[in-house]
Regions:
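A short, glycine/small-residue-rich beta-strand->loop->alpha-helix junction that serves as a flexible
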Residues: 7-19, 218-222
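Conserved nucleotide-sugar phosphate-binding/catalytic loop shared by glycosyltransferases and other
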Residues: 9, 27-28, 32-80
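Donor-nucleotide binding loops and adjacent catalytic segments primarily
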Residues: 22, 191-277, 309
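Conserved nucleotide-sugar donor-binding subdomain of glycosyltransferases
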Residues: 67-107
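A donor-sugar binding/catalytic signature common to diverse glycosyltransferases
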Residues: 99-103, 268-310
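A nucleotide-sugar donor-handling region in carbohydrate enzymes
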Residues: 139-219, 242-247
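Conserved donor-nucleotide binding/catalytic region of nucleotide-linked donor-dependent transferases
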Residues: 322, 327, 331-353, 360, ...
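C-terminal alpha-helical cap of glycosyltransferases
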Residues: 359-383
Length: 383
């Protein structure tokens, strides 16, 4: 079977989960072509996966820890990228897949419909109009148009894949607003994680250990420094901080001995397995990876980013982490770190979700579901 897998490149969470899915599809004997762009495309290619270059659908703009929706819309229109969708259609025509899977990349969905191909939408958010609430009349109107758009998409696709734990443990549940008429087409696959817990060898790290994926660039830089100040308050807790490729880690000349800064980790799963706690933004895929490895999370969602804020709220309600904000003091942050490391209830809930992730096996579950749908469609055509 030939499978086209489109990837939304806004945030590497989409990329990491699509890599996991593509690897499983290849292992199951299918021919897979991934459509991606930017750094997302580069990362996919390092995994040895066949990739075609797509065009971005949206450009995100933010400042001081918040997402600026109006500026993002204006930047997207000015870029003119949406005028190049013909490139996507031509690529789909040349590859001629049997089935299309699109991770929040809607241009790929419309191209699949034009080619009369079965198409499945992978999504962890279906209430995008929240981004436009409380804004100007123009922005609220744009939000209503957006809702009508994706409601139509949800009705017409062949299936909707939610790469999360099934209800009631779904972390992205507050980001889902699905009509009753489409619920039968929704498939909760479980997390899409690149490696299985039992296959990963722990990194040699001093415990207790905190892994922070808060980058040190742009509006997250103040929080990055705040984590370092927190580490100074208790030298018995060890930290690995990911700064991102744009930060020169050599400039940090007076780090406490319990802090290590790294630009990038090629394989972060050994670090996850050796950590007692993760400090992260509110991105869905990072949460799925940490919880699939049984690690509680302190989440700092970007302000004004309703999807991340909802994820963090659900995380706290589920008892596997806490939602915090950028204004927190180092002393208060240390209190939360102690609580999540020392309170068995958080660890037990995270360990339960690790077991559930293993049982669900998201990449394999999606592959088997698509195979079954494809075979059923073939049988129906013959009859």
């Amino acid at each position: 079977m030939k499978i086209m897998l489109f990837v939304c490149g806004e945030g590497l969470g989409h990329t990491s989960r699509c890599i996991s899915l593509a690897q499983q599809m290849k292992a199951s004997g299918h021919e897979v072509l991934m459509g991606a762009y930017g750094y997302s495309k580069d990362l996919i290619e390092t995994k040895g996966l066949r990739t075609a270059e797509m065009v971005p659908e949206i450009q995100l703009v933010g400042d001081s820890g918040s997402l600026d929706i109006k500026s993002s819309v204006i930047a997207t229109i000015k870029s003119g990228q949406f005028l190049r969708i013909g490139k996507v259609h031509r690529m789909l025509k040349d590859f001629d897949p049997d089935i299309v899977v699109s991770d929040s990349y809607y241009t790929g969905i419309f191209s699949a419909w034009m080619r009369k191909k079965p198409v499945y939408l992978m999504v962890n958010q279906s209430n995008m109009e929240e981004f436009f609430m409380g804004k100007s009349f123009f922005m609220r109107s744009l939000g209503k148009i957006t809702k009508r758009f994706y409601t139509m998409v949800f009705r017409k696709v062949d299936g909707i894949i939610v790469p999360d734990f099934p209800m009631p443990d779904t972390i992205c549940k507050y980001n889902l607003d699905l009509e009753k008429r489409v619920l039968d087409s929704v498939f909760y696959s479980g997390p899409l994680v690149g490696k299985k817990y039992r296959e990963v060898r722990e990194a040699e790290l001093k415990r207790p250990h905190v892994l922070s994926t808060i980058g040190g660039f742009g509006y997250r830089e103040p929080l990055f420094h705040k984590v370092i100040e927190t580490a100074r308050l208790d030298r018995n807790i060890n930290y690995t901080l990911l700064s991102g490729p744009s930060i020169d880690s050599d400039k940090f000349t007076s780090l406490p001995e319990n802090v290590t800064i790294m630009k990038f980790i090629e394989d972060q799963f050994p670090y996850l397995k050796s950590s007692d706690l993760v400090i992260a933004p509110g991105g869905h895929s990072m949460m799925m990876e940490a919880l699939s490895f049984g690690v509680p999370i302190l989440s700092f969602p970007d302000m004004g980013h309703s999807e991340q804020e909802n994820n963090a709220t659900s995380l706290e309600e589920e008892g596997c982490g806490k939602r915090l904000d950028y204004s927190i003091s180092p002393k208060k942050l240390l209190d939360h770190i102690h609580q999540l490391i020392e309170n068995d209830a958080y660890k037990e809930k995270a360990q339960y979700l690790r077991s559930l992730s293993h049982a669900l096996n998201g990449p394999e579950a999606i592959t088997e579901m698509i195979e079954s749908k494809y075979l059923n469609q073939g049988s129906q055509k013959k009859s």
